[in-house]
Amino acid sequence: MKKGTWDDDFYTKKAQKEGYPARSVYKLEEIQQKFNVIKRDFKVLDVGAAPGSWTMYIMKLLGEGGFLSAIDLKPLSITVKKPNFFFLQGDAFDQTSIRMLAEKGPYNAVVSDAAPSTTGNRIVDTERSIQLIESIYNTALQVLTPGGNFVFKMFQGGKEKEILEDMKKHFNAVKILKPQASRINSFETFVIGLGKKA
């Protein structure tokens, strides 16, 4: 069995066993363990939340005193009936949606595992990814509190350098990580902005 196949199988089965709808939860878990981006009682915005693995994990981290807003075009495959959770089924590009989410803030952390619909054409997919990242990044800068943290997915081969250089102007530290739970053949990496500057 190829290593990539084994890894995919391992994390998928682990997610099923632990009750998460997708293996992506272990990407955020590793980021959290290394960088502590989400703390108890934080206000957090989750962009591209479906099917809901990150949402479940974040709610466990926050406790009753925290608050989570989440948005996705698709519905969540989980049910969260808690007063400190708000889900908006909508478009993260839409200004009305952004205003609704901003009203629930400001946020101590913005996290995103969002990815555009893919075509199989790496150039097209990378460009779509960049457009999505720029939209999420602009939203994060609007809604984050000073000292806030930002996590997002980026595909290699795009405008990484420009985005990272701009982030250094707005965050005290910028880190890059390809989590172990990412598929072996995936071009994805995660960018972590720590401590938004005032």
Predicted features along the sequence, with ranges:
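A short glycine-rich, Lys/Arg-flanked "PGG" loop and its adjoining helix->strand segment in the class I
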Residues: I130-P146
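Conserved SAM-binding motif I beta-strand of class I
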Residues: F67-D72
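Conserved SAM-binding loop of SAM-dependent methyltransferases across substrates and taxa
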Residues: P51-E64
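S-adenosyl-L-methionine
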Residues: K74-S117
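Conserved class I S-adenosyl-L-methionine
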Residues: R40-A50
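Short glycine-dipeptide loop
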Residues: E64-G65, L144-N149
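Class I S-adenosyl-L-methionine
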Residues: Q156-A198
